[in-house]
């Protein structure tokens, strides 16, 4: 978000100016920790100097004893800094298969988006630092692979129609601590970070806390230099590659992939192109949602693009396929010798017929 784009004209001139009551609003997501309190303090100074309102939103996850008090203290500190409005929201965290950390993150973003929409904020600022970026890269490598794992967190992104920005990705946690000390800003240290624990953290601590407390320091001792900065710069470069690959894949997907509502049964149709199949498979005898992938179009692309197109298409259809399943579908494109279809989650399957790969939940339909 470029604040200069929403700056009130009079604030470009010297002198004291009051921020208008209807000026654009930016919200700082604040947990009360050192990073978010530093961001709140600096954001208020910068926004006020540009005629932009600066508020805060505090999300109480209710997962720790005393969380209500922590949220209240964070809100009071933000008000003391001059931020307004200061919004406190209570999140409902329901951990399912994704784990407690992921469920808490989803609940937090739900509340941040709701607060932004209700207040009319033009953006929500997040206090992730260079250290957080390095931790994210390591977690990505542990849980995933490829350029997406290396790309870390984007500086600006949109979620549920709300713009989020991370202004502190070039600052370290030591620097945000210094900002708080220089400005006399008090902050809260989350006990789940394990800062006060001697030795390795137990396995029941959050993965990010263990990476921060144990893994990153061990790598730094081994490497003999600031690996957080190294990982963060690697993430920036990998994100540029990822954004290009995503853009190119989206272009190819728009030409090669069609999402369709298939009937349970229909007369035989031409299978030379995905759009021909989609047009022919229409009647009122029932349907299933699926994909048609044009082999001739996608086969012209390099493997990196083909795999990305297949993965993105399946994701949009609600199919969370593994890397092995995506590679098997790619073999239907470039190594077709009459092999059988590929079984996918949620009862889906992918089958090739002439120059089209059909992905649907009705295996018999896909094999017609």
Segments (PLM) and residue ranges:
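Mid-to-C-terminal catalytic subdomains of enzymes
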Residues: 177, 183-236, 240, 309, ...
């Amino acid at each position: 978000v470029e604040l200069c784009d929403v700056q009130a004209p009079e604030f470009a001139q010297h002198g004291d100016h009051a921020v208008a009551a209807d000026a654009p609003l930016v919200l700082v997501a604040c947990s009360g920790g050192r990073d978010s309190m530093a961001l709140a303090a600096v954001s208020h100074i910068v926004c006020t100097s540009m005629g932009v309102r600066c508020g805060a939103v505090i999300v109480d996850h209710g997962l720790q004893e005393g969380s209500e008090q922590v949220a209240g203290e964070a809100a009071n500190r933000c008000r003391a800094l001059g931020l307004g409005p200061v919004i406190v929201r209570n999140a409902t965290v329901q951990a399912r298969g994704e784990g407690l950390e992921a469920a808490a993150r989803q609940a937090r973003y739900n509340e941040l988006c709701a607060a932004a929409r209700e207040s009319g904020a033009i953006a929500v600022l997040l206090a992730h630092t260079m250290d957080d970026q390095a931790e994210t890269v390591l977690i990505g490598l542990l849980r995933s692979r490829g350029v997406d794992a290396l790309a870390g967190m984007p500086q600006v992104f949109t979620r549920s129609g709300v713009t989020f920005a991370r202004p502190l990705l070039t600052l370290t946690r030591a620097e945000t601590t210094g900002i708080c000390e220089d400005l006399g800003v008090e902050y809260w240290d989350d006990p789940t970070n394990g800062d006060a624990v001697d030795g390795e953290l137990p396995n029941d601590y959050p993965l990010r806390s263990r990476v921060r407390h144990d893994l990153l320091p061990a790598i730094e001792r081994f490497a003999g230099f600031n690996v957080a900065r190294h990982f963060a710069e690697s993430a920036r470069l990998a994100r540029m590659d990822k954004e290009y690959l995503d853009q190119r894949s989206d272009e190819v997907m728009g030409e090669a992939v069609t999402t369709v509502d298939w009937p349970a049964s229909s007369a035989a149709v031409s299978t030379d192109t995905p759009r021909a199949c989609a047009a022919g498979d229409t009647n009122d005898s029932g349907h299933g949602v699926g994909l048609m992938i044009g082999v001739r179009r996608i086969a012209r692309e390099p493997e990196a693009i083909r795999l990305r197109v297949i993965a993105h298409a399946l994701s949009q259809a609600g199919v969370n396929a593994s890397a092995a399943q995506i590679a098997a579908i790619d073999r239907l494109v470039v190594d077709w010798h009459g092999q059988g279809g590929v079984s996918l989650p949620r009862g889906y399957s992918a089958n090739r017929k002439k120059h089209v790969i059909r992905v649907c939940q009705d295996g018999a339909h896909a094999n017609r």
